[in-house]
């Protein structure tokens, strides 16, 4: 079965989200490592993790699309960003649960 461009874009976004959320325990370990003193410059662990998760998802997603040789249009990027950022509260809840922030 050949997926449509829209199906590929949606499927790859879901894949990127899943992959990055699975990396949250590692991100927490790095962030909380006293060697780096990040807790002195980052005021909110939760917002730090949210920013890290969103940036990692976008990076991973971009790689998935490049591998499929798809360059999203401006409208598709708008949809991608809206879809991702509209889930910020959901991601925060997952971050709280996974890394106990």
Pin down the residues of each PLM region.
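Short terminal alpha-helical segments
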Residues: 1-34
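Charged, amphipathic alpha-helical oligomerization/scaffolding segments
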Residues: 15, 19, 52, 83-86
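Extended alpha-helical scaffold/tether regions of large eukaryotic proteins
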Residues: 4-10, 39-42, 81
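Amphipathic alpha-helical interaction modules
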Residues: 21-65
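Amphipathic alpha-helical binding modules
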Residues: 70-101
């Amino acid at each position: 079965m050949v997926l449509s461009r829209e199906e590929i874009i949606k499927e790859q976004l879901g894949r990127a989200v899943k992959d990055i959320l699975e990396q949250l325990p590692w991100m927490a370990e790095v962030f909380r490592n006293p060697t780096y003193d990040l807790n002195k410059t980052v005021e909110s662990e939760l917002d730090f993790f949210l920013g890290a998760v969103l940036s990692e998802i976008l990076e991973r997603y971009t790689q998935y699309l490049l591998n499929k040789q798809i360059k999203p249009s401006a409208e598709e990027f708008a949809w991608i960003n809206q879809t991702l950022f509209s889930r910020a509260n959901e991601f925060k809840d997952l971050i709280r649960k996974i890394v106990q922030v």
